[in-house]
Amino acid sequence: MSSVAVIDYGMGNLRSVSKALEQVAGKVRIDVTSNPQRIRAADRVVFPGVGAIRDCMHELRRLNLDIVVAQCAADRPFLGICLGLQALLELSEENHGVPCLGILPGRVQRFDAVKADLKVPHMGWNQAHQVRAHPLWNAIPQNCRFYFVHSYYTVPDETSLVASRTDYSTSFASALARDNIFAVQFHPEKSHTFGLQLLANFLTWNGVS
């Protein structure tokens, strides 16, 4: 039986993510775990996260999961969600600058709260404009709406990494993809039909873009 590890480092939206995966899993086994051996044994890995990046990085290192994340992001289908996307970059300007995992080149910066009428965090439904084809977009229409909750967004060094963009005072990268990695700023587990479709696509994806 195929398996998916959902990484538990104390900051993920674990119940919502696991419940959503279970809805589309079929015969795929869902394992919510912080155990490095069980994570490494999984065929696919989901890296969720909510909260502050400094706490995220502290917990990953405390649990020796930073190395596990890097290993899994290198060799199997890997899905990052929200903070799990941001942690893949090199540096976040949150908390006066926090070094991240450095798996994808780029940085994380805050929305410009000085602009008139711009509410931070960016919270609610917004469109994801697909800028490149990818298996995880299968059966998901262009400009589909997903659910967002975040104050920071990724700025990748390479435009080729961007899989979708979303407008919120600026056009920001709402999904990044490279090889076996697909990572999203929105919450597919809270995005109803098309969020579930993205998760279902992930469970059948072979890790080839």
From Swiss-Prot:
PROSITE patterns: GATASE_TYPE_1 (PS51273)
Catalytically driven reaction(s): 5-[(5-phospho-1-deoxy-D-ribulos-1-ylimino)methylamino]-1-(5-phospho-beta-D-ribosyl)imidazole-4-carboxamide + L-glutamine = D-erythro-1-(imidazol-4-yl)glycerol 3-phosphate + 5-amino-1-(5-phospho-beta-D-ribosyl)imidazole-4-carboxamide + L-glutamate + H(+); L-glutamine + H2O = L-glutamate + NH4(+)
A Pfam family matched in the record: GATase
Single GO MF annotation: imidazoleglycerol-phosphate synthase activity
UniProt keyword Amino-acid biosynthesis, yes or no: yes
Positions of the catalytic residues: C82 (nucleophile), H187, E189
Compartment annotation: Cytoplasm
InterPro entries, A to Z: Class_I_gatase-like, GATASE, Imidazole-glycPsynth_HisH
Main location: cytoplasm
Top-rank taxon, per record: Bacteria
Pathway as given in its UniProt record: Amino-acid biosynthesis; L-histidine biosynthesis; L-histidine from 5-phospho-alpha-D-ribose 1-diphosphate: step 5/9
EC id: 4.3.2.10, 3.5.1.2
GO biological process, one term: L-histidine biosynthetic process
Keywords, sorted A to Z: Amino-acid biosynthesis, Cytoplasm, Glutamine amidotransferase, Histidine biosynthesis, Hydrolase, Lyase
Any one annotated GO CC term: cytoplasm
Start and end residues of each Glutamine amidotransferase type-1 domain: 3-209
Function: IGPS catalyzes the conversion of PRFAR and glutamine to IGP, AICAR and glutamate. The HisH subunit catalyzes the hydrolysis of glutamine to glutamate and ammonia as part of the synthesis of IGP and AICAR. The resulting ammonia molecule is channeled to the active site of HisF.
Assembly: Heterodimer of HisH and HisF.
HAMAP family assigned: HisH (MF_00278)
Protein's name in the database: Imidazole glycerol phosphate synthase subunit HisH
Organism in which the protein naturally occurs: Nitrosococcus oceani (strain ATCC 19707 / BCRC 17464 / JCM 30415 / NCIMB 11848 / C-107)
